[in-house]
Amino acid sequence: MKVRFQADADLDRRIVRATRRREQAISFQFATEARSGVGLINLPDDKVLAAAASEGRMLVTHDRRSMPQHFGHFVSAGTSPGVIIVPQNLPLGVAVEWLVTIWSASEAEEWANQILLLQK
């Protein structure tokens, strides 16, 4: 199965829009589209991880500070489709290219319980 992405509430919306524009077949939800439109706004990290996992989506976030720790706790108790951390200073085009490459060159199962920090 192809990777499906879920943006958290803090991810720059331009990343979602540009990725969707670059490859229309990619399933990438804004934070407001998650949980059948209820969204991920103002949820703690553990609930965001649970929501993404319940929909079988890799979480895409800028949160390098607390998300890795919450992710570690989450996968110690269950399974996650994975997390991608996009540094705030990563150029938009580079972030989009990474996400499109991950989507096109891998399967969702390969990312289970994995966390990836994107680099330039």
Predicted regions and their residues:
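Acidic, metal-binding active-site segment of PIN/NYN-like and related structure-specific nucleases
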Residues: 45, 51-72
